[in-house]
């Protein structure tokens, strides 16, 4: 009994720091019980975004049909199909639709009606949240007005007050900004929590824009994917991660991402590649041009040379890493010493294959894993750019802050790929740097 009393005392002392009086504790109990009676907030799960910012923006904007569902619920019997579709487009792509409408003669009337309709939608999507939570999601510049409009009912004595606010917004030419704020709040409240289940980066052109969109949400968690982890490593200066991140970006022709968005200086890589592979067409290494670069258009032949140069550096660094860590059990991935450089073949598990590319001027057959002086200078220069990119560091710090190898939320285990576990479901031990580690 004494041990139980001591334990209770510890809990009470801990609680007293936040709730020093009985009244404080009572109010918090009432609040928590009331909140528990509200409907559960909408959770949105997205994975494998791979830099496709436009598709990601659309999915976020529509909330996978949640917004369309609310519009139909409110206006199916009172608005024609065209107007209902226009409302959805407005919420998803607010600025573009406003720009289209602003040149029309009845723009002010359209704004007045639209604000009224958006408020009705907003009342529905916010109905499952407390006022405190809604305020946190509101754009700060219109928070007071939005709060007033959302809390005003249909009572006759409040009707004039309600419409006078809307009239005042239009009279001072704040209607466009207010509609943008309303649409933003609707999008925010249509999804209570955003779960990103890995692979924000690589392949697509703008993971940077995806990150900026994610960072506008109040409630976010991120389970790191393999394509995110090497960017995390690159931002910390890991040479092998730098090589892999740069290689994949070049492979998919994402020069805008590297140079324009993140300020990664590729001049040393282009100069090195052009010199070392001057007479080599590097056909095997031609990048996949799925998307065009707007700001940093690189010649396809030069891009292929750059791709080959950084790939060879990565292969060497990978072999060095595996050699340093035999406990990884990845010796089968050491391939540079399996190549017959004279005949242009490779021996894998007793079978000889002809190589598609046989020109390796930077590889010493006697020591194939060693970087040349030029390669070492180049990868160090790239690492410096990754470490000193303010935008990249801001994005990676956010991923560190909001993420992990796995996340547990609402009883759900979220992870992107594979996590080593034992048969009973507990985390397996992995030997790293002289010790066995498990978990997170």
Give the residues covered by each predicted segment.
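Feature recognizes metal-dependent phosphohydrolase scaffolds
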Residues: 1-440
């Amino acid at each position: 009994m004494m041990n139980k009393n001591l334990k209770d005392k510890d809990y009470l002392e801990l609680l007293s720091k936040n709730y020093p009086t009985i009244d404080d504790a009572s109010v918090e109990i009432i609040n928590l019980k009331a909140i528990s009676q509200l409907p559960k907030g909408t959770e949105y799960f997205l994975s494998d975004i791979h830099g496709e910012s436009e598709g990601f923006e659309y999915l976020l904007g529509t909330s996978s049909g949640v917004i369309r569902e609310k519009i139909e619920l409110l206006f199916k019997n009172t608005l024609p199909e065209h107007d209902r579709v226009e409302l959805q487009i407005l919420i998803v792509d607010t600025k573009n639709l406003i720009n289209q409408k602003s040149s029309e003669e009845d723009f002010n009337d359209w704004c007045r009606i639209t604000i009224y309709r958006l408020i009705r939608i907003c009342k529905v999507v916010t109905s499952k949240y407390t006022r405190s939570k809604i305020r946190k999601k509101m754009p700060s510049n219109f928070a007071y007005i939005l709060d007033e409009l959302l809390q005003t009912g249909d009572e006759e004595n409040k009707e004039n007050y309600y419409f006078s606010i809307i009239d005042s917004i239009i009279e001072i030419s704040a209607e466009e900004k207010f509609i943008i704020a309303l649409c933003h709040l609707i999008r925010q409240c249509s999804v209570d929590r955003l779960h990103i289940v890995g692979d924000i980066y690589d392949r697509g052109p703008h993971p940077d824009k995806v990150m900026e969109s994610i960072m506008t949400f109040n409630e976010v968690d991120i389970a790191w994917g393999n394509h995110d982890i090497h960017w995390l490593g690159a931002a910390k200066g890991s040479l092998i991660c730098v090589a892999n991140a740069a290689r994949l970006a070049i492979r998919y022709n994402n020069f805008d991402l590297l140079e324009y968005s993140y300020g990664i200086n590729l001049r040393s890589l282009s100069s090195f590649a052009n010199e070392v592979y001057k007479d080599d067409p590097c056909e095997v290494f031609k990048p996949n041009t799925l998307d065009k670069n707007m700001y940093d258009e690189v010649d396809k032949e030069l891009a292929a040379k750059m791709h080959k140069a950084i790939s060879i550096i990565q292969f060497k660094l990978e072999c060095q890493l595996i050699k340093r860590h035999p406990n990884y059990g990845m010796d089968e991935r050491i391939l540079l010493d399996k190549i017959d450089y004279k005949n242009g073949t490779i021996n894998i598990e007793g079978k000889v294959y002809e190589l598609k590319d046989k020109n390796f001027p930077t590889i010493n057959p006697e020591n194939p894993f060693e970087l040349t002086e030029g390669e070492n200078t180049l990868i160090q220069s790239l690492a410096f750019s990754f470490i000193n990119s303010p935008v990249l560091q801001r994005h990676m710090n956010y991923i560190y802050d909001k993420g992990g190898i796995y996340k547990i939320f609402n009883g759900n285990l979220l992870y992107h790929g594979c996590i080593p576990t034992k048969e009973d479901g507990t985390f397996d031990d992995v030997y790293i740097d002289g010790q066995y580690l498990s978990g997170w």
